[in-house]
């Protein structure tokens, strides 16, 4: 919900943010016309978040985790979790394009414990997963974790 600041509107033209009260501050009445989901074959959404589930956000005590992507802020909102980010992407693309959840391996540098659950959540919440990037799987020897996470999503 903050990428509009960067001029990005990968939503479907059927999604009108002007109808969402908290978005009226930035969305114009015609903003929905700039949505381009219908022109995509696939949309890969970056789910580069420390929180995996919306429940994790609810349990947070003010520590937001790594937030280095453009357009991010420090709020404790569901959009900053793998589950919540995927939910928003699916909602605003309106089913006109497959949504693939992208997981950045080094988001979990220092503690790879959440990597597997992030992959599992991305697979459960979207139409597939893209791991960014294979070099990190090799470097950190995470192939077994990836396999287990993919099986857990079945």
Model-assigned labels for residue ranges:
Residues 1-110:
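Glycoside hydrolase catalytic-domain groove-lining segments
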Residues 110-128, 132-154:
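Aromatic-rich peripheral "rim/lid" segments of glycoside hydrolase catalytic domains that contact
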């Amino acid at each position: 919900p903050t990428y509009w600041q960067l001029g990005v509107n990968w939503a479907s033209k059927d999604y009108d943010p002007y109808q969402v009260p908290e978005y009226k501050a930035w969305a114009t009445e015609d903003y929905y016309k700039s949505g381009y989901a219908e022109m995509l074959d696939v949309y890969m959404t970056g789910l580069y978040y420390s929180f995996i589930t919306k429940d994790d956000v609810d349990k947070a005590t003010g520590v937001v985790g790594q937030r280095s992507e453009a357009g991010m802020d420090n709020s404790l909102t569901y959009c900053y979790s793998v589950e919540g980010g995927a939910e928003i992407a699916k909602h605003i693309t309106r089913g006109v394009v497959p949504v693939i959840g992208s997981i950045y391996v080094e988001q979990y540098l220092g503690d790879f414990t959440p990597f597997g659950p992030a992959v599992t959540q991305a697979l459960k919440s979207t139409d597939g997963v893209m791991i960014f990037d294979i070099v990190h799987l090799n470097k950190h020897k995470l192939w077994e974790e990836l396999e287990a996470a993919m099986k857990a999503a079945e």
